[in-house]
């Protein structure tokens, strides 16, 4: 029986990992053993941060809404409570977008919310 070697398969696997490690510093972009560790860690960070990004953007939207609402003499928590009472269902992403790009529209929403405080 002849010996079976995995030449093509392992070469392709090495090539795939080294391609993912392109741009890494030191031996991490040329040495397979180091590269595989760095690529695995990078993929772990990417997985974690895809979830953290959602958290970070929600915090950013809240900060923007709070800053815009304070210009009109309210606080974020009061404003959100008033929106609930006024039955205005606009999510934080849209509110933050309005606060930054359409201050007149946002001011009218604040006036509607103030009526329900």
Curated annotation (Swiss-Prot):
GO cellular component: ribonucleoprotein complex; ribosome
Keyword tRNA processing included in the entry's annotation: no
PROSITE patterns reported for this sequence: RIBOSOMAL_L20 (PS00937)
CDD domains attached to this UniProt entry: Ribosomal_L20 (cd07026)
InterPro entries documented for this protein: Ribosomal_bL20, RIBOSOMAL_L20_CS, Ribosomal_protein_bL20_C
SUPFAM superfamilies: Ribosomal protein L20
Domain of life: Bacteria
Biological process terms in GO annotation: ribosomal large subunit assembly; translation
Molecular function via GO: rRNA binding; structural constituent of ribosome
Transmembrane feature ranges: none
Record keywords, A-Z: Ribonucleoprotein, Ribosomal protein, RNA-binding, rRNA-binding
NCBIfam families for this protein: rplT_bact
Stated family: Belongs to the bacterial ribosomal protein bL20 family.
Purpose: Binds directly to 23S ribosomal RNA and is necessary for the in vitro assembly process of the 50S ribosomal subunit. It is not involved in the protein synthesizing functions of that subunit.
Name this polypeptide is given: Large ribosomal subunit protein bL20
Gene assigned in the entry: rplT
